[in-house]
Amino acid sequence: MSTLPADDFRTPTANGSSLIRQVEETDLPELVRLDEEAFPEGPYPFFTLRQLFDLYPDHMLVLDGGENGLHGYVLVGMPRDAHRCWILSLGVTRDRRGRGYGRQLMAAVLRQLRDDAVREVLLTVEPSNITAIELYKSLGFAAESAPRKDYFGPNADRLVMTLHL
């Protein structure tokens, strides 16, 4: 895990600072807006984000820009076998992409998972999303040899990537 950035999660922005923190119930409406912006072709509906919040509140982090709202989030699914988990979603608003916020969200949640004694972290990514694949590789994730065809249904192939903590 030596590739993780420093432990300071505060990141300068044009209007002050953003803070990575645990999601709160009052964040859910704003989280829906953020998810719709980050994933316009397939955002989570409110009820799904609500259920994921109810199931995994300790492993759902947001990038809070204060009065400017939420700019990113990462969501981890923790099954009963807490030694293995899945990154279910990582999203950053368009105006904040390319600034390292996705990396910081991932680093924060990976530190949290390491502290929770998780040994294996998996995620899926669209095979054409080279930017995300490179981010995950830079954090130590390794890709399976080939994308899984129709992983999320017809024409929704995904590359499965794994990190051993």
Map each language-model feature to its residues.
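Acetyl-CoA-dependent GNAT
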Residues: 3-18, 22-95, 106-108, 112, ...
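Short aromatic/hydrophobic contact patches that present stacked aromatics
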Residues: 89-91, 122-124, 160-162
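Active-site acidic-Proline motif in GNAT/NAT acetyltransferases
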Residues: 93-95, 99, 127-128
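Acyl-donor (CoA/ACP) binding surface of acyl/acetyltransferases
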Residues: 99, 103, 118, 147-148, ...
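Conserved catalytic-core motifs of GNAT/GCN5-like acyltransferases
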Residues: 122-125, 137, 142-158
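Helix-turn-helix
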Residues: 132
